[in-house]
Amino acid sequence: MTIITDVYAREVLDSRGNPTVEVEVYLESGAMGRALVPSGASTGEYEAVELRDGGERFLGKGVLKAVENVNEVIAPELIGFDALDQIGIDQHMIELDGTENKGKLGANAILGVSMAVARAAANALDLPLYVYLGGFNAKQLPVPMMNIINGGEHADNNVDIQEFMIMPVGAESFKEALRTGTEIFHSLKKVLKSKGYNTAVGDEGGFAPNLSSNEEALQTIIEAIEQAGYTPGEQVKLAMDVASSELYNKEDGKYHLSGEGKVLSSEEMVAFYEELVAKYPIISIEDGLDENDWEGHKMLTDRLGDKVQLVGDDLFVTNTKKLAQGIEQGVGNSILIKVNQIGTLTETFDAIEMAKRAGYTAVISHRSGETEDSTIADIAVATNAGQIKTGAPSRTDRVAKYNQLLRIEDELGNLAQYNGLQSFYNLKK
């Protein structure tokens, strides 16, 4: 019934018009699972390798090598495997690749297969993916972390911080949270328009206006929240992804906030965050310092770790070895989970489990280059992660995840839980 009979990959396009890998896995029963692989713009130094072809085709971004690796190398190995053996299949692909960073076959090849196998198995058993992956206890809907103003690598403007987000923590359900976030998004558009700013959207569906400073972004969002009829700090909190590795200059060891004309040391960056947290209802800061600035991260954790979620993205790259190092050193209190940073579902689930055991939160995340694939929505519920970061309520590649979460909440009925502020279980409120 669940024996794999065929594995097939093709090259398709992601939301930025760049090629990516799509994989289909076919089972004896006739069931099929399909998965598409996402891709990031600002990538951590220690991420698993995304295989690109180079050359002139698609400006070097083609993925025919990764597709060939699925069709010629991985497929013959997996035919005959039971799709229910997710751990065995993922382990076999890791061994087949044989490198620390999946650089031989490509994390984009391996991940596509890993996700498609899970979907095929769920379809064969006639189970929703979140139930197949998480069992009967999978019932917590995540608080959305909605990126509504873009800066940094995600936009061409004077804003240094990559993402300014809203989190509707005061809602009673996911449906209400999504409505809150969406109303604020539309309110923000009006506010920006009234100030004469551009309202075109960036990679993740958020606006990318040419604001004069990072603080103006926060002030504008507060205005939008209030104009939408919500209370900042109570019903809606703010979150930021600084993506500091993009601001860090290795030569002088300083952070260059070119939009503001500032050059700051690690200590000055921490002081900058303390100032912002004192002024605005910020509940989460991601990658506040460079991925190799462990001393700076420790300082930030010591100063703000009790009241602000400090998320490691480039810092931990969904990697249990990096996360273990962070836990041991008391660095950060949360991990961002991106399936393509590590490359298999098994390793993704291992990272989430390790984080939770250590009292860290886990935030399930999209990438800036996304597709219509909504697997991460199911993963968020399957693992009861409590938080999801998947862009603004704009662009189908982002909304696909939100719509899937609405379906899941509907399906769960009275069993569905939305924990709001309780999702930040390790903060001393």
Curated annotation (Swiss-Prot):
- Please name the pathway: Carbohydrate degradation; glycolysis; pyruvate from D-glyceraldehyde 3-phosphate: step 4/5
Q: Does the keyword Cytoplasm apply?
A: yes
Report the active site residues: 204, 338
Q: How is the cofactor bound?
A: Binds a second Mg(2+) ion via substrate during catalysis.
**Gene Ontology cellular component list:** cell surface; extracellular region; phosphopyruvate hydratase complex
Q: Which cofactor does it need?
A: Mg(2+)
Compartments annotated for it: namely:
Cytoplasm; Secreted; Cell surface
Q: Which InterPro entries match?
A: Enolase (IPR000941), Enolase-like_C_sf (IPR036849), Enolase-like_N (IPR029017), Enolase_C (IPR020810), Enolase_CS (IPR020809), Enolase_N (IPR020811)
UniProt-annotated binding residues for (2R)-2-phosphoglycerate:
162, 338, 367-368, 389
Q: What does this protein do?
A: Catalyzes the reversible conversion of 2-phosphoglycerate (2-PG) into phosphoenolpyruvate (PEP). It is essential for the degradation of carbohydrates via glycolysis.
Family per record: Belongs to the enolase family.
This one is known as Enolase
Give the encoding gene's name. Answer: eno
